[in-house]
Structures are given as structure tokens and as C-alpha cells.
Amino acid sequence: MKHLIFITALFVLSCNEKTQHTAQGNLQEDSQESDKIKVLNFATFHMGNTSDSKSVEFDEQNRKNQEDAKKIAQMISAFGPTVICVEVPASESEELNTEYTKYLKSPNKASTYYGEVGLVAFEVGRINNVEKLYGIDYRLEYNYNINNDLKNEIDSATFNNFQSNPFASIPELNIFEEGLSLAEKLSRMNHPKFLDFLITANADILTYVGSKNGYEGADEAAEYYKRNLRIYSNLNRLPLTKKDRVFILSGGSHTAFLNEFMQRSLKYEVVNTFDYLK
């Protein structure tokens, strides 16, 4: 009987220790989570000239559009960013900040520099007293239309079905629907399903394209992955601290890739965009 009591007591003690270790582990996990740099990773369409194969119509010179963009900037500003990154090549950061300085001196005059950069990012920076912006883009050409350059021997049916009706799986998120406000377009773009769709549309769909023994489509898709990895690498070059709050404004497909990378990151914690886009 004494042996039984001893064994039972030992078991209870062991369970208590395990519970304590588990609790400590959870606390450490929460602590590590809170130590990560908060990032608001925001998807947009290009509000100025773009080389994108399909673009949303938007007149950046239109006064109402400029006012609507400013309202978006005010929503985003509630995040309180200390660092702002935009889809401008890192090599053009000096020009970027020259234009930003001009805007700070005359904020009542809308800037259309790189479209959404001038209309949204500059205003977010002004409201939050951010001294300078960072360009993190890396230009890398790839062939969206590789299917037109060869006889597709892989799976032309799947590829063509997607191209003929790309929004078939997410009709409720079609950003080309007429009558949508700017806020609604951006709300749809930042929906997780739409971001997944953008990775499919810009890269993964090309894996269905290729010659009999070739990987032409996959190779083009790899170029787009490469571009986004380099954008991520440019982000990682920035001298950030754990106290920084980072706002990234870029075309939707880049937002989608960066989300994928940062969700696995030991350094960043992506916040919910819809806490600010309301």
C-alpha cells in the first residue's frame, strides 16, 4: 500500500512538473511572439502607369480618387508605422525620398509619384512623422505570356480554363466589377483567398505550360518567385529593431508572396490588415 501511495505521489509530482514546463513553454512562446517586429503588409493595385498584364482603371489625377486614397492612408495610419517600405527599386531610394520631401513641404498638393506610393504611402508617412521611406523592389522581367510562344504539351486545358475565367473560384472577390469604391477594391485585394489567387495567377498557373520535355512555364514562374525572394531579402537588409512597426505597400502579388515568407519568419509578425482597412 505504501508503495502504491509513493508511486501515485510521484506520478502527481511528475504531472505538475510537466504542467509547469508546458506553461513555461507557452509563456516563452508568447514572449517570442511579442518580440517579433509587427508588419502591416498591404496589397494594392497600381494607381499609376504599370507594366502589369491586366490593370485596374484608376485616374490618379482625379480629385475624388486622390481624396479616396487619402482616406485609405488615414485608416492605415492607425497602425502607427515607424518604417515604410514601397514597391520602388532599392536603387531609386534617393529619388523616392526627394519626392517624399517635396510632398512633406506641400501636402495639400497630391503626389502621383509611382501612383499609390505618392497618393497613399507619402500621406501615411506624413501623418506618422516618418523621416524617410525605403524602396525594396527588385526589377526582374519574366514572360507572363510564355503559353503564346510554344505548343503547350503539359496541360493546356487547365491553363486555358483558368485564363478564360480567372475569378471562377472567387467571383465575390472580382476587383474588376463595376461600381466598386476604392476601399472595396482594396478590401477584396487583401482578402486571403484573393492573395492566394494572385500567386496562382502570376506564377503557379505557368507550371501547366511547357513543351513535351521542357519546363518553360515552370522556369518563368521560378523567375517570379526569385523576384519576390529578392524583395524579401531587401526588406531583411533594413536596420530594424524590435520596436519598429513596418508598413509595406506593394502590388498584390508581392504582398501575397511576402505574407507567405513572413508567416514562417522568426523575425516578423504580420498583423491583420482588416484591423485597419474598415
Residue ranges and their predicted role:
Residues 59-61, 69-75, 91-98:
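Post-signal peptide N-terminal segment of secreted/secretory-pathway proteins
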Residues 1-33:
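Bacterial Sec-dependent N-terminal signal peptides
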Residues 48-50, 92-96, 142-145, 255-258:
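Short catalytic/ligand-binding loop motif for oxyanion handling, primarily in non-cytosolic enzymes
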